[in-house]
Amino acid sequence: MSGIMVVIEQREGRIARISWEAVAAGQSLASQFGLPVNAILVGSDLEFLAAEVAARGLAKVIRVEHPLLAYYTADGFKLALEQLIQTEQPAYVVFPHTYQVRDYAPALAARLGQVLIGDVVAIGEGPLFTRQLLQGRLNGNYRHAGNGPCFVSVQAGAFRAETTQTGASEVTGFTPTIDAAQIRTKPSEPFRGRSQTVDLGSAQLIVSIGRGIKDAENIPIVQELAKALGAELAASRPICDNGWLPMDRQVGSSGQTVSPKLYLAIGISGAIQHLVGMKGSQCIVAINKDPDAPIFEVADYGIVGDLFEVVPALIAALESQKG
């Protein structure tokens, strides 16, 4: 067995950021063993997407195509990937940890006599796979034992999409054998929820507010800071639940997952539900008057103080720098 296979999730011709994060995880894993990394696209008419993926410095990109894979079904994806894995014999199979992957990947691993190590947040030497337990209060380390490929899914924000390598990749095709009778579910048209007007996942600078803001009428103070920084404004769940900011501004387990260059957390205590959505940020700065607030445990820099004093001082400092 050799090589690392990264399954790229695409929907309606678009590749989600978490798929690039999975590629970064696969390339990080490959650096330990000098193994080639192959990206896998599943669907139909994948030529355009394959060209996009092929620019990421991979050994090859494999287009797994069949008319019955045009729309996602758990049966179709399991059958197609099982045949590909049996043909390619990879040592590791890496997935982005998405709802779709959770639907089919555990069963795929079981069909091949394996288990899925899900929601991995770090990969250490060995390799050692780390995932969070008890709502993030503990870390558990896992190793793969036995023969057969190791199946892993990586948590959103745990690996940086921008660290993927660059360079041309070979593109090949694979046609699985699938019969319509093997597909036990009938795909419907993709669900289209309310359009999300704010893509916090692509923001490089984020200013986020929590309960410490006290009242909706105080939000303009932080909005002014965000404007001075050229940052997107975000919030923890209580702010959005109260209707003080739209739901598409929410960061956390029930909101968006972000990994900006700077995440400025203002008046946020640091509940685990919020931390899982922003802990992948490159630099976290926290402002909170409670010195024991959990947010300081993940912050790179912390200011213990009243936000209503600190934020105006920051705005004044930024304005003075602009001259």
What is the role of each PLM region?
Residues M1-G323:
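N-terminal glycine-rich FAD/FM-binding segment characteristic of electron-transfer flavoproteins
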